[in-house]
Design a protein with these regions (language model features):
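Flexible glycine/proline-rich
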Residues: 21-24, 39-45, 52-53, 66, ...
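Short beta-strand-to-loop elements that line the ligand-binding cleft
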Residues: 243, 453-460, 558-572
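A ligand-binding cleft/hinge motif common to bilobed small-molecule-binding domains
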Residues: 477-493, 574-603
Length: 646
C-alpha cells in the first residue's frame, strides 16, 4: 500500500514502536545536559521552588547564649550544696532581662538576675534556675532549693545553626520549614530554579470548552485542565492556550507561537495515525532534531509522541484522558521536574492480590489502574476499568500495576506490586462492591457528610457477590432475579452473607417515542415485535449484571442484532437508544425519563444488599444501615423515582 493510499484510508501505521525505556533514553539524550534557568526571589515567592545553590548560614542561631526558661541567671558553683534542707541564698541584681534586652549588670558570685525565656544570658552566669525552684526572701534576695549544673537551661550561640555551615543544599524544595530556617538567619532573598514556562494546547474538532453548550458529537475538553493542573502541581507555570481544531495551518501557527514564548510545549490529541490527527506531522517542522520517539509499547499510551525542537521539548500526549494522564505522570513529569531542578517524586509501593484475571495485549507493557480494598488476608487490587477514554479511572485509582509485554494476562489470585499515586494507602471506612445505582450515591453522600470514606466499585451483581464471599467488601449491592423461585436476591446468598433490603426500582424496555413498533405495546408484545423485525437493533447489558440476567430470561434462546453490544450502565443503554445507535434496551424508569425515552414497564426489581455477616458490627456498616432508614434517605429515594419496601 502506498503512502497516499494509507493517508486516504485515514489509518497510517506507527513506523517504529519503542519500549518505554528506549523512548525515554532518546528523549533524555536530546534534552540533556542543559542549564537550569535561575532567578532571585523573596522567601514568600520561592515557596515550592528548588534552591539553585547551597545556602550558607551568615550568622549563628541563636546569635547569643539564651535562656530556655523563665527563672534566674546564676553561677552553678553557688548552687553546689543547694537543697530543700539547706537552700542557697542569692542577692538579686537590679535588672530584669527580657527578650530583646541586652544585659547591663554581670552576675557575680552570690548574685542572680531575673531572666525571661529567650533572654540573653548575662556575663558571669553559666546556668539558669527555674522560677518554680526558688523562693523570694527578705533583703531583695531569693532562696534556691535545688542544685544547678553548668549550662543548665541555656542554649549557646550557634547551638542550632553555626555561622558558615550549609543551611540548605541546592535542589532542596522550599517549604514552610525551610522558609523558617532562612528567615531565622536573616536571609530575605534566595536563588531558585525558575519555574518552567509550559504551554498547553488541546487539539480536536470535537472539543468543547467547559461552560459552553455541548454540540452533537462534541465532548468537553478535560485534558487541557488536567494537564495544566498537573504541571502546576509539579512546579511548572502552565499556560493553557485553548483547544484548536484539526486545521493543520492554524494549529502550526499556534504551536510556533506557543513554543516561541515558552520553554516546553505539551499538546493532547492528534498524535495517532487516524484521519484528522495532524499534530505529529507539524512537530517535525518546528525545529531540530524533531521527533525522537513516536509510538511507545505501552497500554495505555501507545500514540505518545516525543520531540525536541531547537532545544525545547515538545510532547504530544494521546487524546484519551487516561492515556494522556498516565503518560504525562509516568514519563513526562519526571523530566519536567529535572528541568526545573526539582528532586524526583517519591514512589511508594505495596503488594496486593488481584482477585480477577486481567487480560493483556502481548508485545505492550500494560499499566492497569487499580483501587485498593482491605481483604481478610491483606490488600486486594480491583481494576478500575472503563478504558483509556475514561476520566474517572485515573482520578479514582489508588495506583497501578504493570503487566509485562511478554504476558497475555495476570491470573486471578496473583500477588502484584502496586505503585501508589499518593505516599500512603487510603483505606476506606466502608467498601461497597457490586451493582451501581443513583440511589447508592444518595447513601454514600449521607455517610460522606458524616465524615466516613466509602470506596464503591461497580462490577455488577454477580461480581459483588463473589467479592462478598471472598470478604473483600463490607456490602455488595445486588438485583438478581431467580426464575425458579420467582424472587429476588435471597436465593443467591451463601453462608456468611445476609440480606439487607434496599429499594425497589422499575425496570423496563426503552425506545424512542417516535418508534411506532413499540407504541402502545406491553413488554411481551414489544419483545415479539423487536425479534420479528431484523432491522430492529437492541443494546444489551454486561455479563454478570442483574439487568443482563433479566434480559436473557426475556429473550430465551434468541440473540437479536445488538445482543453483543454490552455496556456497563443504565445510562449507556439510554444514550444508545436516544442517539439512534440502538432501537431498544432495558433500563430503569428514572434513567429513561431523564433521557426523554418511551418506557414499557417490565418488572419491579429489588435493589438490595448482601452484607458480610462477620463485618456487621463495624461502625461504618452500622452507619450505612442507619442511613438506609433515615428521613433524609427516604425522602431522597422517593424524589429519584424509587420506592422503599413495606
Amino acid at each position: 500500500m502506498t503512502r497516499s493510499t494509507r493517508q486516504d484510508t485515514g489509518q497510517e501505521q506507527f513506523l517504529t514502536v519503542l519500549s518505554r525505556d528506549e523512548a525515554l533514553a532518546r528523549f533524555e539524550a536530546a534534552l540533556f545536559p542543559r542549564t537550569i534557568p535561575t532567578e532571585e526571589l523573596t522567601l514568600a515567592d520561592a515557596l515550592g521552588l528548588a534552591l539553585a545553590d547551597d545556602v550558607m548560614a551568615p550568622i549563628d542561631v541563636p546569635p547569643f547564649d539564651r535562656s530556655n526558661v523563665d527563672g534566674f541567671a546564676v553561677r552553678a558553683a553557688d548552687m553546689a550544696t543547694a537543697s530543700e534542707a539547706l537552700p542557697a541564698r542569692l542577692l538579686l541584681n537590679h535588672e530584669t532581662i527580657a527578650c530583646g534586652v541586652a544585659p547591663q549588670i554581670p552576675v557575680l558570685a552570690g548574685t542572680a538576675t531575673s531572666i525571661s525565656t529567650g533572654g540573653p544570658v548575662p556575663r558571669g552566669a553559666d546556668a539558669i534556675v527555674m522560677v518554680e525552684h526558688t523562693q523570694p526572701t527578705e533583703g531583695d534576695a531569693i532562696e534556691v532549693r535545688r542544685g544547678a549544673s553548668p549550662g543548665q537551661f541555656i542554649s549557646n550561640a550557634g547551638s542550632d545553626i553555626a555561622r558558615g555551615e550549609v543551611l540548605l543544599r541546592a535542589g532542596t524544595v522550599i517549604g514552610s520549614r525551610e522558609i523558617g530556617m532562612l528567615a531565622a538567619c536573616g536571609i530575605a532573598l534566595v536563588t531558585v530554579a525558575r519555574k518552567l514556562r509550559v504551554a498547553v494546547l488541546s487539539t480536536g474538532d470535537e472539543l468543547v470548552q467547559p461552560g459552553d453548550v455541548l454540540r452533537p458529537a462534541g465532548i468537553y475538553d478535560a485534558n487541557g485542565a488536567i494537564v495544566s493542573a498537573a504541571i502546576t502541581e509539579n512546579g511548572g507555570e502552565a499556560s493553557f492556550l485553548g483547544a484548536y481544531p484539526d486545521d493543520e495551518a492554524k494549529l502550526e501557527a499556534a504551536m510556533r507561537e506557543a513554543l516561541a514564548a515558552h520553554e516546553v510545549l505539551i499538546l493532547s490529541g492528534g498524535t495517532s495515525k487516524g484521519a484528522g490527527d495532524v499534530s505529529h506531522r507539524i512537530v517535525n517542522r518546528l525545529g531540530a532534531p524533531g521527533i525522537v520517539a513516536h509510538g511507545v509499547a505501552l497500554k495505555p499510551g501507545k500514540p505518545l509522541c516525543l520531540a525536541v525542537c531547537d532545544g525545547k521539548p515538545v510532547v504530544v500526549l494521546p487524546g484519551f484522558p487516561t492515556s494522556a494522564m498516565f503518560t504525562l505522570h509516568d514519563m513526562i513529569v519526571p523530566l519536567l521536574r529535572r528541568m526545573a531542578g526539582l528532586p524526583p517524586r517519591t514512589e511508594a509501593k505495596v503488594t496486593a492480590k488481584v482477585p480477577l484475571r486481567i487480560p493483556s495485549e502481548l508485545g505492550r507493557t500494560e499499566f492497569v489502574m487499580v483501587s485498593l480494598v482491605e481483604g481478610d488476608e491483606g490488600l486486594v487490587a480491583y481494576p478500575t476499568g472503563k478504558g483509556s477514554g475514561a476520566i474517572t479511572s485515573f482520578a479514582q485509582a489508588d495506583g497501578f500495576i504493570s503487566i509485562e509485554a511478554l504476558a497475555d494476562n495476570m491470573p486471578a489470585g496473583s500477588e502484584a506490586s502496586v505503585t501508589l499515586f499518593t505516599p500512603h494507602v487510603r483505606v476506606p471506612d466502608l467498601v461497597v462492591i457490586g451493582s451501581n445505582c443513583t440511589g447508592l450515591d444518595l447513601v454514600v453522600g449521607i455517610l460522606f457528610r458524616a465524615g466516613l470514606t466509602v470506596r464503591s466499585i461497580a462490577v455488577g451483581s454477580l461480581g459483588g457477590l463473589a467479592a462478598a464471599k471472598r470478604s473483600e467488601c463490607d456490602i455488595a449491592p445486588i438485583h438478581l432475579f431467580d426464575a425458579k423461585t420467582q424472587s429476588y436476591n435471597a436465593p443467591f446468598l451463601s453462608d456468611g452473607l445476609e440480606l439487607v433490603e434496599g429499594w425497589r426500582r422499575m425496570q423496563g424496555i426503552v425506545y424512542r417515542p417516535s418508534d411506532i413498533r413499540f407504541q402502545g405495546a406491553d413488554a411481551d408484545e414489544a419483545v415479539r415485535a423487536a425479534l420479528a423485525d431484523p432491522n430492529c437493533m437492541m443494546v444489551n447489558r454486561n455479563q454478570g449484571s442483574g439487568t443482563r440476567i433479566l434480559i436473557d430470561q426475556l429473550l430465551g434462546p434468541a440473540r437479536p442484532d445488538g445482543y453483543w453490544n454490552q455496556p456497563r450502565s443504565h445510562n449507556a443503554v439510554a444514550a444508545a437508544v436516544a442517539q439512534n445507535r440502538a432501537d431498544w434496551g432495558v433500563t430503569i424508569a428514572p434513567v429513561a425519563q431523564s433521557a426523554g425515552l418511551g418506557f414499557i414497564a417490565l418488572k419491579e426489581e429489588h435493589y438490595d444488599f448482601a452484607l458480610v455477616s462477620a463485618r456487621n458490627e463495624r461502625p461504618a456498616v452500622q452507619a450505612f444501615l442507619t442511613a438506609l432508614t433515615s428521613p433524609e434517605f427516604n425522602e431522597g429515594i422517593e424524589r429519584m423515582g424509587f420506592t422503599r419496601p413495606g
